[in-house]
């Protein structure tokens, strides 16, 4: 372990909390230096921290806000196998995505990722060409899965299903002249922000210092001024290498980086509005050959309907907002496949994220490469940008490889390909965990420990499938420092404003109980 654990005696070395943050801030402020400073607490940054810490390097990660504050919490929550990239001829990223999906589902995070069926209904407007294109794509996805060595017991093969079976999977699908459906399987995360937190905690268990509400200023390749955004105190941290993993804010740390962000928007619906589907209704976008709108069954009885791809020029906001045009587009597209059309009254909330795409020239943002890049600037800051949530581990590996070479660091080989995250276990082990299914899906083998927090730990919060013990665990183990962290990133209650309002008193109580 690169650094000794700084938690209390006998404490969980992966636990992140306010006391640990204060202790580690004080230690660093006394003038120590580290091998690697990581700026950015999204999926890429925490991935870099974990990779470096498990190679034996001393690591500090800082984020001005919170873990998963930016794009990492606004995804479709898919561990995507890369089928779209295959359709556009990008075989390399397609295979990389399939391999990384398999690693998540079978080794590193099987507790957080499940196989999700996607259903494309065969409706009167589905042409023979359209059907053939989808079927060919799904078969290609089967080949991708096989070449990535993900077993069919984890991700079943694609298949055609009858009209009656299609209605069982998606009860709201249009019934008139339904000619069956085509189904394929992909990986679905219980939540993207939860994956980020789990990676951060795993990094912490290997000695990485994870400091949120800490900004990095006057950044060079060997140092940065760190500021505690809660107190205003500052100090200079020296590091042998610095990695910029700030996503859509990367050019603020390294002005030589040129990004062209695109906005991806989702709507949040009540699962009842689609008859509580167990498959993701997948609707081709008219006029497009390899783009779809997905109605994704999600936790807490919700549906995430997305996604758009719109240019987002100008200043980068902390929290992007969906446009009216995007809301209308998503509703209009999914309604082509529904028996009863959705309206704006069915929309409980929206969320939008900005993709940190490298600017490679003209064309629409939908056509820009999703490849990641690792760039070393004139000031020796190493920036990792682009890519996809699914491929975070490989992005991190490439960034740390670059940092090791640039800084002449004495580091071991990458270990993250086979390293389980906190709570991870095989499906057979997870099935034996004595806790409600929702808790096991979010916490894996830690679910029993979560339940043990408080006498009324299983009491529901705001009438949702979230219990009071989860709020307590977020404060004691997951680095939540305020109610926004609890409601907007650790639990995702905040995606629906009315749910957030009802849960606010419970969230405030979780901090008073510390």
Task: Give the label of every model feature segment.
Residues 244-256:
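Flavin (primarily FAD) binding-site architecture
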Residues 32-34, 231-241:
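Core beta-strand elements of the Rossmann-like FAD/NAD(P) dinucleotide-binding domain
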Residues 24-28, 33, 65, 111, ...:
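C-terminal accessory subdomains/tails of enzymes that are appended
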Residues 29-44, 60:
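Beta1/beta-strand and adjacent pyrophosphate-binding region of the FAD-binding site
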Residues 53-73:
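Glycine-rich FAD pyrophosphate-binding loop
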Residues 212-224:
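A conserved short coil-to-beta-strand element within the FAD-binding core of flavoproteins
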Residues 1-36, 51-54:
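Extreme N-terminal leader/targeting segments of oxidoreductases
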Residues 77-169, 292:
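Dinucleotide-binding Rossmann-like beta1-alpha1 core, especially the glycine-rich loop
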């Amino acid at each position: 372990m690169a650094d000794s654990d700084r938690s209390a005696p006998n404490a969980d070395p992966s636990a992140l909390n306010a006391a640990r943050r204060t202790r580690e801030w004080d230690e660093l402020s006394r003038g120590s230096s580290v091998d690697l400073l990581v700026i950015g607490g999204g999926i890429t940054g925490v991935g870099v921290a974990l990779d470096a810490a498990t190679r034996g390097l001393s690591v500090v990660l800082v984020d001005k806000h919170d873990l998963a504050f930016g794009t990492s919490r606004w995804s479709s929550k898919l561990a995507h196998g890369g089928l779209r990239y295959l359709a556009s001829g990008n075989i390399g990223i397609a295979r990389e995505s399939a391999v990384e999906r398999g690693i998540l589902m079978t080794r590193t995070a099987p507790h957080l990722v499940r196989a999700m069926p996607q259903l494309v209904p065969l409706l009167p407007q589905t042409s023979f060409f359209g059907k053939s294109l989808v079927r060919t794509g799904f078969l290609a996805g089967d080949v991708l899965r096989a070449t990535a060595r993900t077993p069919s017991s984890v991700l079943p093969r694609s298949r055609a299903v009858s009209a009656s079976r299609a209605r069982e999977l998606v009860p709201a699908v249009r019934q008139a002249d339904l000619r069956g459906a085509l189904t394929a399987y992909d990986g679905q995360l219980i939540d993207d922000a939860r994956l980020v937190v789990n990676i951060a905690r795993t990094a912490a268990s290997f000695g990485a210092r994870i400091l949120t509400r800490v900004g990095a200023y006057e950044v060079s390749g060997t140092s940065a001024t760190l500021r505690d955004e809660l107190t205003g105190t500052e100090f200079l941290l020296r590091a042998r290498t610095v990695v910029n993993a700030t996503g859509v804010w990367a050019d603020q740390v390294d002005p030589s980086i040129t990004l062209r962000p695109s906005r991806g928007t989702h709507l949040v619906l009540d699962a009842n509005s689609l008859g509580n589907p167990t498959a993701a209704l997948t609707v081709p976008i008219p006029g497009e050959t390899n783009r779809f709108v997905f109605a994704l069954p999600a936790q807490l009885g919700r549906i995430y309907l997305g996604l758009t791809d719109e240019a987002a020029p100008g200043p980068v906001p902390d929290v992007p907002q969906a446009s009216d045009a995007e809301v209308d587009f998503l509703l209009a597209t999914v309604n082509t496949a529904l028996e009863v059309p959705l309206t704006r009254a069915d929309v409980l909330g929206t969320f939008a994220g900005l993709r940190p795409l490298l600017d490679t020239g003209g064309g629409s943002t939908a056509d820009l490469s999703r490849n990641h890049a690792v760039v070393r600037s004139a000031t020796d800051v190493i920036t990792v940008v682009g890519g996809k949530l699914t491929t975070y581990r490989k992005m991190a590996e490439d960034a740390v490889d670059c940092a090791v070479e640039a800084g002449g660091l004495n580091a071991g080989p990458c270990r993250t390909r086979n390293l389980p995250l906190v709570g991870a276990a095989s499906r057979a082990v997870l099935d034996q965990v004595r806790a409600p299914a929702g808790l096991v899906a979010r916490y894996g083998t830690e679910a029993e420990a979560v339940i043990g927090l408080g006498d009324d730990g299983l009491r529901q919060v705001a009438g949702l499938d979230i219990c009071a013990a989860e709020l307590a665990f977020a404060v004691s183990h997951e680095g939540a420092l305020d109610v926004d962290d609890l409601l907007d990133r650790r639990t995702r209650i905040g995606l629906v404003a009315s749910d957030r309002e009802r849960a606010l008193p419970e969230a405030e109580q979780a901090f008073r109980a510390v």
